[in-house]
From Swiss-Prot:
GO cellular component, one term: extracellular space
Organism: Pongo pygmaeus (Bornean orangutan)
Transmembrane segments: none
Name of the protein described by the UniProt record: Prolactin-inducible protein homolog
Cysteine pairs bridged by disulfides in the record: 65-91, 89-123
Length: 146
């Protein structure tokens, strides 16, 4: 009986070891892959009616491919290629870069939006996933007109 009591009695060293293992397991669970990584690049300032090129680079850390739709939204209406929407298959080994050329004569806030969508005929064999947690990602920049 005494041997059984020793076996079930937790020493401080054992408790410390279990605590460290638990903390390590929780930290490892925080290392999740990013669904969308985006880099939106526009000039900070331009002169009125100068051509502006907006560049959006998109990649993922997921192992599965996704169908994405990218587009721009502005605080004031802009014409031309600004309104183009791009649809593409995004995979971890194949990042995408999108370009928009437009003109403006007013200071404007611009949001680059990436939606993960369900659409057939974009990814090979229609093999694509849709994240449960988030399916819309965006970033905003301000374009100053001097």
């Amino acid at each position: 009986m005494h041997l059984l009591q020793l076996l079930f009695r937790a020493s401080p060293a054992t408790l410390l070891l279990v605590l460290c293992l638990q903390l390590g397991a929780n930290k490892a669970q925080d290392n999740t892959r990013k669904i969308i990584i985006k880099d939106f690049d526009i000039p900070k300032s331009v002169r009125p009616n100068d051509e502006v090129t907006a560049v959006l680079a998109v990649q993922t850390e997921l192992k599965e491919c996704m169908v994405i739709k990218t587009y721009l939204i502005s605080s004031v209406p802009l014409e031309g290629a600004f309104n183009y929407k791009y649809t593409a298959c995004l995979c971890d080994e194949n990042p995408k870069t999108f370009y928009w050329d437009f003109y403006t004569n007013r200071t404007v806030q611009i949001a680059a939006v990436v939606d993960v969508i369900r659409e057939l005929g974009i990814c090979p064999d229609d093999a694509a996933v849709i994240p449960i947690k988030n399916n819309r990602f965006y970033t905003t920049e301000t374009l100053e007109v001097e």
